[in-house]
Amino acid sequence: MSVLDENQKQFLLDSIRNIPDFPKPGIQFKDITTLLNDPKAFGFLIDFLTDRYARFELDYVAGIESRGFIFGAALAAKLEVGFVPIRKKGKLPSTTIAEKYSLEYGFDEVEIHIDAFREKEGSRVLLIDDLIATGGTAEAAVKLIQSAKGHCVEACFLLNLEELGGAKKVSNLAPLYTLLDI
């Protein structure tokens, strides 16, 4: 069960609320809080991902701040592997490595603890987040995993905003899996 059928896709899509004109006019914001507070939808998603990734022999799940933490921590617990947060600059308390990425107007950075994978070179890491748009943050996250001597076995996203091209950008760095392409 590693591919959703059309009914399962629709079930998940129906559990995600669209907020028009947020955070600015013309944007259709995908609000996953409605999926998170629906125990059947959230449970189905985590069970589906657990089934998919059980065979990957993972060492860690890495989640991108902040919604990637929700899915990543739940999935890591079910898979009985470690969870590694990838955070915005200045949010992690110990020694970090950082990766810059471009925004519409400027740059931002994400960080990971330098010893996130407990110095186990080649740790098998799944990267997860709720959504991929332009791919800048996800691309930086894959590079961070590599810089910390991990191996990103796959990058997983619940939603892929296809027209923005981020999935293609990230798939050049790591295998990619998206559940819902919209």
From Swiss-Prot:
It is an enzyme of class 2 (transferase). InterPro entries: Ade_phspho_trans, PRibTrfase_dom, PRTase-like, UPRTase/APRTase. Signal peptide: none annotated. It is found in: Cytoplasm. SUPFAM superfamilies: PRTase-like. It catalyses: AMP + diphosphate = 5-phospho-alpha-D-ribose 1-diphosphate + adenine. GO terms for molecular function: adenine binding; adenine phosphoribosyltransferase activity; AMP binding. Its main location: cytoplasm. Keywords: Cytoplasm, Glycosyltransferase, Purine salvage, Transferase. Its EC number is 2.4.2.7. One of its GO terms (biological process) is adenine salvage. Belongs to the purine/pyrimidine phosphoribosyltransferase family. PANTHER family: ADENINE PHOSPHORIBOSYLTRANSFERASE. Homodimer. This is Adenine phosphoribosyltransferase.
